[in-house]
Amino acid sequence: FCLWWNEDMLYRKICEGSQYTGYECVIKVNGKPAKLDGAYCLDPTHPGTKEFISREVQNKKKEGFEYLKVDFTSNGMVQADSYYNKDVTTAVEAYNEGFSHFISEVDKGEPMFIALSIAPIFPYQYGNSRRIACDTWGKIGQSEYSLNAVSGGWWTNEFYQYNDPDHLVLVGNDADKETEGENRARITNGAVSGMVLVSDNYSLEDKSGRGDAKLSRERAQKILMNKDVNEMA
């Protein structure tokens, strides 16, 4: 439900997969296009928004993806002056209409795992997992941040299959120089949260110039194979 566009693009650029400009598709608050967290908020009930969603989901299905991360969904929960569907008057109604359309597209053909990020806790029925906090990296303070969120939000596993602690970075781009201890803490953080999604470059022939693929492999073989942590998970 986001458009990461500049203001001038709203009036001249067409939403992909539709015949509508960005200005036509976004909600208005006090008569002006509304933004949240730097992105314009799409009207979940607008046909242009729905056509855009249909196009994106079906493209990903054709490419063979089975996992789909849906970020900044909270932009679809912003109260507008009005909606394209005049029977809808609240942000929750609009969100439900837009996400119901999204799920109808996801349900066509092979199933997909839907991971929600920066998403309202409720309504909860549209995702398999939900990010328990915001972006979380590999330093010890980040693990503390994520575990604090788990301590306060553990009960959401009654609604979602998985509480997502974010991707678990061991080395990443190697800019932060995480220690093995920080790596162990972060992987344990993922295990107790209930979802482990590793995110490093493990290539045997890495030519990206980013991170340290050899170190990532060494750390992964040592830390991700920790029997005690894996049994707990």
Regions found by a protein language model. Give the residues of each.
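Non-catalytic C-terminal accessory modules of carbohydrate-active enzymes
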Residues: 204-233
